[in-house]
Amino acid sequence: MKKFLKYLLVLIILILIAGIVFLFRPIASKQVQTAKDEPVVDAVLVGGGIMSATLGTYFTELEPNWQIRMFERLDQVAQESSNGFNNAGTGHSGFMEMNYTEEKNGKMEIAKAEKVASQFEVAKQFWSYQVKQGVLAEPKTFINPVPHIAFVWGDNVKFLEKRYAAMIQSPLFKGMKFTEDPAVIKQWAPLVMTDRDPTQKVAATRMEVGSDVNYGSITKQLVNHLNQNPNFKLQTSTEVTGISQNDDKTWTVSFKNLKTGKTDHVKTRFVFIGAGGAAVKLLQLTGLPEAKQYAGFPVGGEFLITDNPAITAQHTAKVYGRAELGAPPMSVPHIDTRYIDGKKYVLFGPFATYSNKFLKNGSQLDLLASTNKSNVLPMTTVGLENLDLVKYLVSQVMMSDEDRLNELRKYYPDAKAEDWRLSQGGQRVQIIKKEPGKPATLQFGTEIFASKDGAVTALLGASPGASTSPYIMLNLLEKAFPQQTEGKWNQKLHEIVVSYKQDLSKDPVLLDKVRQYTSSTLGLNYTSPFKAANDETAAAPVAKAN
């Protein structure tokens, strides 16, 4: 027994030593020796998703002569988070997402919903411009009109009524309709009301100008257009293995072809890491002090999906419910109309899954590989402070097929198991951030990382993500290139995004003009709140000077 305890103690000590060595290992890339006369490109985009495609499009329109490289580890672009089946495609506008509004001290706070709605208006302007320029094809190939509905029952009816009363005071939500009449809700979303208990108290709001967006289609179309530019080069099946700074303050991005095993590098003045969940790991390679404050917490999602025409024909809406008390924002249930590659589907979910992977096509070692001496304590602290989230994830992972079907029946009472299949969605990596002098926090939104000189940038986090990608990348341009966005790029940015630098939540006239323009261009449903405008032909509004 003593011998066993001795060996056990030695084993524990060895494990502790190995753990300490692992945590204190160097994680930054080694500097690559490059030739003085080696060519330097203007920008490297890591990841072939919606963010890189959008930023690359901005660059080619603002600086047509820039040399740009894009690296994607899979054999095609738009196969991870941007893929149609890997995201909810909701066109987040703040219309139906009740987690964007909360009641504080008896007052309904709608600022976050206004923020998201304003950002999506920027996205629609960006896509409209690309349609006008022939960069994006027929709008229905990537966006379709789908009303956005918030639906509740029981005690949540009062919450929705208060939410509606507050939201219609904002120009961004003019035109929103509210009802407690089951017959009206059945007209809006037949599946939701079919065979529902007639004694159950229900309520819903509806925004006609809502949409469903296929971000995979947008990504592919943008990248296809970028490929027509001789100054742009896409390399697929290529994994970025290092990002290091050179003595002249440029950066070297090292990469490996996953099919041939060949390694190489490229020097660049600017790096954007738009690699979805893998952005945290790649950012650590830079060795930047600012990057040490980040860690990641991966969460996956599953959806029940049907393409049965008898069901999909009855549902043309995105219906969002309200998360259970104490549940995290990612748990908001919704039953959505989706148009993917020309076919109509209905999805319900999400059901959270757990995996150590940072990407759907990643490795189970991703979480471990991102752990180091700088973030291990913040990760532990956040885990202990968010036991409700841990409990929620455990309950979700333990769900049976019958449990998931019962959840679906809360939104589609007549649902039958044989009509639905379970589909694994994408991975999202929530940010764990430890700023100096502040406690570590778990964040549920997106965050732009920019080095002090703006040469290295990254997008971290999850929702609303793809829905507001044109706004997010515009914000990134402002952080990384402040002089250009205020100077020589300013006029072009106003041409691409007419409302650039304008607050649409405070300018109902401009908002109306913008929505008429984008809705007519993208084929969306919109009725102007101004009677006088209803008789006018929608045209692109004149950009305001900065």
UniProtKB/Swiss-Prot annotation:
Pathway: Carbohydrate metabolism; tricarboxylic acid cycle; oxaloacetate from (S)-malate (quinone route): step 1/1. Keywords: FAD, Flavoprotein, Oxidoreductase, Tricarboxylic acid cycle. Its EC number is 1.1.5.4. GO terms for biological process: tricarboxylic acid cycle. It catalyses: (S)-malate + a quinone = a quinol + oxaloacetate. Its cofactor is FAD. It holds the Pfam family Mqo. GO terms for molecular function: 2-hydroxyglutarate dehydrogenase activity; L-malate dehydrogenase (quinone) activity. InterPro entries: FAD/NAD-bd_sf, MQO. It comes from the Bacteria. Belongs to the MQO family. This is Probable malate:quinone oxidoreductase. The lineage of its organism: Bacteria, Pseudomonadati, Pseudomonadota, Gammaproteobacteria, Moraxellales.
